[in-house]
Amino acid sequence: MPRPTVARIDLDALKHNFRRARELAGTAYAMAVVKADGYGHGIRSVADALAPETSRFAVACIEEAIAIRGAGHRHSVVLLQGTHQKDDLAECERSGFEPVLHCQQQLSWLGAGRSPRFWIKVNTGMNRLGFRPEELPEVMAGLEEAGLKHLAIGFVTHFACADDSDSEMTGLQTRIFERAVAPWPDLMRSVGNSAAHFRPNQPLYEWSRPGIMLYGASPMEGKTGAELGLCPAMTLQAPLITTRVVRAGESVGYGASWTASQDTRMGMVAIGYADGYPRHAGTGTPAAVRGQRIRLLGRVSMDMLAVDLSAVPEAREGDMVELWGKTVSVDEVATCAGTIGYELLTGVTSRVPRVHE
């Protein structure tokens, strides 16, 4: 019989969160970003849940796009990193994938065979991928000369600081983008990551790209998902496998990093960093059992962690402990571990089964 440690995926929560994104997008359409195996939730099941809600998905690479096709969905699929080799363009054309082209090498691959419809990435200040605004006239002229401009769908950029409500950079990037693409009003525009949906008066143009918000985690500094009207889609659970009383003066776990100041009832939970639970989540990190919040004690081990059961004396072996979900948000755990909810959700390992409900 398998270990009961599990990630439960609430498909209704996914749908709720997408509808929230669509509501915030206003007149823009919303493409569902399902990269990184649907942010750890299972790309095929996420695509199944959201297919009736959207006409476009977005992924990082062609393997993820192929997984969506393998699930039977014929939606347009945007490849946010474009293609990594020339031969992939023919597959994009055959399968209806839309690569985001961001460099001269990718442009040079066009026209060598079957060319797909594509987006063009504009670097407005994040300086990861994309053409600088002053390079766009030459890019577009080259496409016109090669007879490929008709395959261009639109322009894309990505915000560096949209999660920070006090930052002025998003407004600056928006203005740079608008000026850069103004000569081609017939092409569509896409700028809005999850955080951009929550910025008042932020233009989202024709297509927004909600990602982390679809899974119920917060994209905004200082705001919880619940405060933003989102529902957690993943509940990570593991069983209590033993309980004991640690006597005053005794310590728990590797490094003896926590010592009891008084007799304390504790339990061991069958989950650890080999399952994707963050090793740096130390004493005080919240969890929950029987609907009540508890706290971690000491260091997280590879396959186990310890919790303080003082607040829930009725807790017993076999009870399921929520590591994150509806009682304890993934963002709370991430803060305690010095990271972000994105990393935790995408980091749940393959030995934790996903149960879609």
From Swiss-Prot:
<keyword id="KW-0413">Isomerase</keyword>
<dbReference type="InterPro" id="IPR020622">
    <property type="entry name" value="Ala_racemase_pyridoxalP-BS"/>
</dbReference>
<comment type="pathway">
    <text>Amino-acid biosynthesis; D-alanine biosynthesis; D-alanine from L-alanine: step 1/1.</text>
</comment>
<feature type="modified residue" description="N6-(pyridoxal phosphate)lysine">
    <location>
        <position position="35"/>
    </location>
</feature>
<dbReference type="GO" id="GO:0030170">
    <property type="term" value="F:pyridoxal phosphate binding"/>
</dbReference>
<dbReference type="InterPro" id="IPR001608">
    <property type="entry name" value="Ala_racemase_N"/>
</dbReference>
<feature type="binding site">
    <location>
        <position position="302"/>
    </location>
    <ligand>
        <name>substrate</name>
    </ligand>
</feature>
<dbReference type="Pfam" id="PF01168">
    <property type="entry name" value="Ala_racemase_N"/>
</dbReference>
<dbReference type="GO" id="GO:0030632">
    <property type="term" value="P:D-alanine biosynthetic process"/>
</dbReference>
<dbReference type="GO" id="GO:0005829">
    <property type="term" value="C:cytosol"/>
</dbReference>
<dbReference type="Pfam" id="PF00842">
    <property type="entry name" value="Ala_racemase_C"/>
</dbReference>
<comment type="similarity">
    <text>Belongs to the alanine racemase family.</text>
</comment>
<dbReference type="InterPro" id="IPR011079">
    <property type="entry name" value="Ala_racemase_C"/>
</dbReference>
<dbReference type="InterPro" id="IPR000821">
    <property type="entry name" value="Ala_racemase"/>
</dbReference>
<dbReference type="GO" id="GO:0008784">
    <property type="term" value="F:alanine racemase activity"/>
</dbReference>
<comment type="function">
    <text>Catalyzes the interconversion of L-alanine and D-alanine. May also act on other amino acids.</text>
</comment>
<feature type="binding site">
    <location>
        <position position="128"/>
    </location>
    <ligand>
        <name>substrate</name>
    </ligand>
</feature>
<dbReference type="InterPro" id="IPR009006">
    <property type="entry name" value="Ala_racemase/Decarboxylase_C"/>
</dbReference>
<protein>
    <recommendedName>
        <fullName>Alanine racemase</fullName>
        <ecNumber>5.1.1.1</ecNumber>
    </recommendedName>
</protein>
<feature type="active site" description="Proton acceptor; specific for D-alanine">
    <location>
        <position position="35"/>
    </location>
</feature>
<feature type="active site" description="Proton acceptor; specific for L-alanine">
    <location>
        <position position="254"/>
    </location>
</feature>
<keyword id="KW-0663">Pyridoxal phosphate</keyword>
<dbReference type="InterPro" id="IPR029066">
    <property type="entry name" value="PLP-binding_barrel"/>
</dbReference>
